[in-house]
From Swiss-Prot:
It is found in: Secreted, Extracellular space, Extracellular matrix; Cytoplasm; Secreted. Homodimer. Binds LGALS3BP. Interacts with CD2, CD3, CD4, CD6, CD7, CD43, ALCAM and CD45. Interacts with laminin (via poly-N-acetyllactosamine). Interacts with SUSD2. Interacts with cargo receptor TMED10; the interaction mediates the translocation from the cytoplasm into the ERGIC (endoplasmic reticulum-Golgi intermediate compartment) and thereby secretion. The modification N6-acetyllysine is found at K13, K19, K29, K128. The gene is LGALS1. GO terms for cellular component: cytoplasm; extracellular space. This is Galectin-1. Its main location: secreted. Keywords: Acetylation, Apoptosis, Cytoplasm, Extracellular matrix, Lectin, Phosphoprotein, Secreted. A beta-D-galactoside binds at H45, F46, N47, P48, R49, H53, N62, W69, G70, A71, E72.
């Protein structure tokens, strides 16, 4: 995967929302949005997989604590199409993160690290970011 956007010092607090809009590559295999304290401490690893690591059209979410991955959570909802422009909204809560997909479907992922602020955002893979907004 090519290295994409990395942003730090975001200071996203509980109750706030991060919107990421971008273009999925026409030949997409997978892309990643990571949120957390830094690259070794992620409260959310959001990884839509078109065809990667044995997963087909599956969203894999995880956390990373001190460099160690947690248990994966898989979502079968998959509203992503290669070559399309999509928006993902991630609402940061004290106990969990709510991810709203482009088709309006929402699911939650626990804030396993109990972070009080998200400082780090990284995007990677077959996804070109067009806009990042904070609400």
């Amino acid at each position: 995967m090519a290295c994409g956007l990395v942003a730090s010092n975001l200071n996203l607090k509980p109750g706030e929302c991060l919107k990421v809009r971008g273009e999925v590559a026409p030949d997409a295999k997978s892309f990643v949005l990571n949120l957390g304290k830094d690259s070794n401490n992620l409260c959310l690893h959001f990884n839509p997989r078109f065809d990667m690591h044995g997963d087909i059209n599956t969203i894999v979410c995880n956390s990373k604590d001190g460099g160690a991955w947690g248990a994966e959570q898989r979502e079968s909802a998959f509203p992503f199409q290669p070559g399309s422009v999509v928006e993902v909204c991630i609402s940061f809560g004290q106990t969990d993160l709510t991810i709203k997909l482009p088709d309006g479907y929402e699911f939650s992922f626990p804030n396993r690290l109990n972070l009080e602020a998200i400082e780090h955002l990284a995007a990677d893979g077959d996804f070109k970011i067009k806009c990042v907004a904070f609400e």
